[in-house]
């Protein structure tokens, strides 16, 4: 976790950064037949101050939105809003091809307080998507980018303005490889493996 680089410690305590947060899903059911043609999933706080980019997205691709704070009066033609769900119900409600991890007021880059936060810390949203069986899309300058590229469980982009072209150049076979890897990572997340690994190091 890159935030550790920003912290100066004056103690002798052993620290260990989680690669990604675990996310337990009761009664998980694996998805089949995912396709890269599906909409991009955005789940979480959809309010202007955290997700203002939702109101200035390009016309493609399509987006499926889940969460609170969304201003439906400003909904774009390529957005479908499904409302909010209880945490245990949300994973099974998600529909799409990729989960998007993006914050801030701009679709050009992750900006503002919430966008800058992604440089240094991991998002629980990423764990939700992966644990639910979806590959993810992350900002190229985010703390999660290296993890995603190393595990080949998603893609990174510098701007959402580039996303249509990136997806057009991604073959169905390449997408299915991302799905396979995302499901493998997701299983470890659901089992609590990343926390257990951290505890083993600390012990």
Regions found by a protein language model. Name each.
Residues 1-15, 147:
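A short, active-site helix/loop in glycosyltransferases that binds the activated sugar's phosphate group
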Residues 6, 52-56, 166:
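A short acidic, amphipathic alpha-helical/loop segment
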Residues 91-132, 138-146:
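Nucleotide-sugar-dependent
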Residues 17-95:
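Conserved catalytic-core segment of nucleotide-activated headgroup transferases in glycan assembly
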Residues 32, 158-161, 165-167, 172-203:
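A charged, aromatic-enriched C-terminal amphipathic alpha-helix characteristic of glycosyltransferases
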Residues 151-157:
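A short acidic/histidine/glycine-rich donor-binding loop in glycosyltransferase catalytic cores
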Residues 2-6, 47, 136, 143-144, ...:
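Alpha-helix capping/helix-boundary segments
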């Amino acid at each position: 976790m890159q935030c550790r680089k920003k912290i100066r410690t004056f103690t002798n305590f052993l620290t260990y950064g989680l690669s990604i947060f675990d996310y337990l899903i009761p009664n998980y059911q694996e998805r089949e037949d995912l396709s890269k043609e599906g909409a991009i999933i955005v789940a979480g706080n959809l309010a202007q101050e955290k997700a203002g980019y939702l109101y200035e997205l390009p016309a493609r691709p399509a987006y499926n939105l889940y969460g609170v704070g969304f201003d439906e009066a400003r909904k774009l033609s390529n957005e479908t809003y499904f409302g909010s769900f209880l945490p245990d119900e949300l994973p099974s409600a998600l529909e799409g091809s990729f989960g998007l991890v993006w914050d801030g007021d701009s679709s050009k880059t992750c900006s503002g307080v919430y966008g800058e936060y992604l440089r240094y810390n991991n998002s629980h949203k990423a764990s939700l998507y992966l644990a639910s069986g979806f590959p993810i899309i992350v900002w190229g300058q985010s703390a999660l980018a290296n993890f995603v590229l190393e595990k080949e469980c998603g893609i990174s982009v510098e701007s959402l303005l580039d996303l249509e072209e990136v997806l057009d150049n991604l073959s169905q076979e390449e997408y299915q490889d991302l799905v396979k890897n995302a499901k493998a990572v997701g299983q470890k997340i659901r089992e609590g493996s990343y926390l257990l690994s951290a505890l083993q190091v600390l012990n």
